[in-house]
Regions:
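Short glycine/proline-enriched turns and hinge-like loops at secondary-structure junctions
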Residues: 154-157, 164, 174, 231-234
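Conserved short histidine dyad/triad with adjacent acidic residue
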Residues: 141-155, 174-178
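A short beta-loop-beta micro-motif enriched in histidine and acidic residues
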Residues: 137, 150-160, 206-207
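Non-heme Fe(II)/2-oxoglutarate
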Residues: 18, 53, 231-304
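Transition-metal
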Residues: 2-121, 260-266, 288-292, 299-304
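A gly/proline- and charged-residue-enriched helix-loop-helix capping module
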Residues: 108-142
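Catalytic micro-motifs at enzyme active sites that drive phosphoryl/nucleotidyl and oxygen chemistry
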Residues: 21-23, 88-92, 128-132, 147-153
Length: 304
């Protein structure tokens, strides 16, 4: 896709011109698009600050951040965490090896929380949606990737703004509403915990959309749209802002359908009947969520 060349004006974090506003207003949470930003100018996201942030992440009692090494392929699985490296060491060697680092929930640090709040304010203005009211649990994450590394095909359950701040890479995105791309069974398995259920195959080629991103540009990816990423021959740093819908009955409906299908029945596809989706979400969907939350809390308390 053609690169965007217009700079972001003034002190705006995201470009506010007519072109950018139209993209956000028309495509947010419906279709991927390329946008412009100025996050690459922020000291918070430069390597010296990231090294300090990685150390803070390591020092936390409950470590949410993650790193791995290896050379995964598009249709493969993610890499493995090396036993002989710490998070900070992996970041220090990011240009030499084949590492992929995720600094998770960095908005828990005060300076990053302030940045996230500024992002939410501007993104609400651009989309025309009050993201603080219609969406919840906004998450600020940083991805740092070694040269030429692939991030395998997968999907995320949140709407995602991915802003490139260092290096360049290509993001390949697929339409989650196309049953050839993502079957109902794959969606049901994903929402009941099998995050690897959606599988890439050769016929999918290089995405229905592909975006070449560089510092100052980024990609919006709607919730559940499968994607994979190919880094170029440089270290890549990307800032991700994720949002979850406050009300999303389709999730509960998919969870209900998963077990309904196990009984040999053919459940109604979510989206065809909002009232049916709502009933499913309020009954079994809520029960599943409660059971999952209880299990997660217990495992965290027991350290397993």
């Amino acid at each position: 896709m053609a690169a965007i060349t217009h700079p972001v004006a003034g002190s705006e974090l995201f470009a506010q011109d007519t072109e950018n506003r139209k993209l956000f207003a028309e495509h947010f949470d419906h279709q991927p698009f390329l946008f412009r930003h100025a996050l690459n100018t922020m000291d918070l996201f430069q390597m010296p600050a990231l090294l300090k942030l990685a150390q803070k992440c390591m020092d936390k009692r409950q470590q949410k951040s993650h790193f791995e090494t290896g050379q995964p392929v598009v249709d493969g699985f993610f890499g493995n965490k090396p036993a002989d490296l710490t998070l900070v060491q992996a970041l220090e060697r990011i240009g030499e090896g084949s590492n992929w680092i995720i600094l998770k929930r960095i908005h828990e640090e005060p300076e990053n929380r302030e940045a996230l709040e500024a992002f939410i304010t501007e993104l609400s203005e651009l989309t025309g949606i009050d993201l603080r009211r219609k969406y919840h649990d906004p998450i600020l994450t940083i991805f740092i990737t070694s040269p030429n590394r692939v991030t395998p095909y997968h999907l995320d359950g949140e709407a995602n703004f991915l802003a490139q701040v260092q290096g360049s890479k290509t993001v390949y995105v697929y339409n989650a509403n196309d049953p050839y791309i993502l079957t109902e069974e794959e969606k049901e398995k994903y929402w009941t915990g099998n995050l690897l259920a959606p599988r890439w195959h050769e016929e999918l080629s290089n995405g229905q959309w592909h975006f070449d991103v560089k510092p100052g540009t980024g990609v919006f990816n709607p919730a559940t749209f499968p994607h994979w990423v190919k880094n170029t021959d440089n270290v890549s740093v990307s800032v991700s802002v994720n949002f979850k819908r406050v009300r999303n009955d389709s999730i509960g409906a998919y969870r209900t359908n998963y077990f309904t299908r196990k009984l040999g029945l053919r459940p109604t596809v979510p989206g065809k009947s909002p009232s049916v989706d709502r009933i499913k979400s309020l009954t079994f969907g809520n029960l599943y969520t409660g059971m999952h939350s209880t299990r997660k809390a217990l495992r965290s308390k027991l350290g397993v």
